[in-house]
């Protein structure tokens, strides 16, 4: 397992190119699994279920077709994006379990900062109850699987400019807002969040099994 960390924002095309190359190498057993933690410059991405009507400010930032599941989301500085390239041939061919584990990864990491992240039936991602029936989204998930190799992953709001989410209907859900660690009073650094994510990953996913691959 390789952990990669980007010190400066990574362009979206560069990230896509890296993932395409890496998952091909994982499939051919020429590279190991990888988690890449990074930030992007401000941009919007459209998943395969995105409704064009949900792009409210099309000229605000660059918009990219992501190829992942889900709808529109915002990426930008202060948001920790995790691209998770795992070999499900070795880990059990269960995409639902993989998505559930990504949610658990964020829930555990948030708990280290005394934030209670929660799942919601029918709404992939992580939510925080704010009282009075209000709840805001703090973590998003959008994945793709090719030949049982995962790519894309999750985005956790640490200290992004939350106003930038107003240019879209985030994940197609207009009834709820977005929040971040800083918005909730937890002024964690990205490096502190990275450490929490790594610990949570080890607890949730564990090491990659070493048994031989089955044909696909």
Swiss-Prot record:
Residues 29-209 form the BPL/LPL catalytic domain. Its EC number is 2.3.1.181. This is Octanoyltransferase. Belongs to the LipB family. The record marks 137 as: Lowers pKa of active site Cys. The active site is at residue 171. Keywords: Acyltransferase, Cytoplasm, Transferase. Catalyzes the transfer of endogenously produced octanoic acid from octanoyl-acyl-carrier-protein onto the lipoyl domains of lipoate-dependent enzymes. Lipoyl-ACP can also act as a substrate although octanoyl-ACP is likely to be the physiological substrate. Substrate binds at residues 68-75, 140-142, 153-155. Pathway: Protein modification; protein lipoylation via endogenous pathway; protein N(6)-(lipoyl)lysine from octanoyl-[acyl-carrier-protein]: step 1/2. One of its GO terms (cellular component) is cytoplasm. One of its GO terms (molecular function) is lipoyl(octanoyl) transferase activity. It holds the Pfam family LplA-B_cat. It comes from Rhodospirillum rubrum (strain ATCC 11170 / ATH 1.1.1 / DSM 467 / LMG 4362 / NCIMB 8255 / S1). It catalyses: octanoyl-[ACP] + L-lysyl-[protein] = N(6)-octanoyl-L-lysyl-[protein] + holo-[ACP] + H(+).
């Amino acid at each position: 397992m390789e952990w990669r960390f980007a010190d400066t924002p990574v362009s979206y095309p560069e990230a896509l190119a890296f993932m395409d190359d890496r998952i091909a190498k994982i499939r051919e057993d020429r590279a190991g699994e990888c988690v890449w933690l990074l930030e992007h410059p401000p941009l919007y991405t459209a998943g395969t279920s995105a409704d064009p009507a949900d792009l409210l400010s099309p000229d605000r930032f660059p918009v990219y077709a992501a190829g992942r599941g889900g709808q529109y989301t915002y990426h930008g500085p202060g948001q920790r994006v995790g691209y998770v390239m795992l070999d499900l041939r070795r880990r059990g061919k269960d995409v639902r379990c993989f998505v559930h584990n990504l949610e658990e990864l964020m829930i555990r990491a948030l708990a280290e900062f005394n934030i209670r992240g929660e799942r919601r039936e029918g709404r992939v991602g992580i939510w925080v109850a704010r009282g009075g029936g209000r709840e805001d989204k703090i973590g998003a998930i959008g994945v793709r699987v090719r030949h049982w190799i995962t790519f894309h992953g999750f985005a956790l709001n640490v200290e992004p400019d939350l106003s930038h989410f107003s240019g879209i209907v985030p994940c197609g859900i207009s009834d709820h807002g977005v929040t971040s660690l800083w918005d909730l009073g937890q002024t964690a650094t990205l490096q502190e969040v990275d450490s929490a994510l790594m610990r949570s990953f080890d607890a949730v996913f564990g090491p990659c099994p070493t048994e031989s691959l089955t044909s696909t």
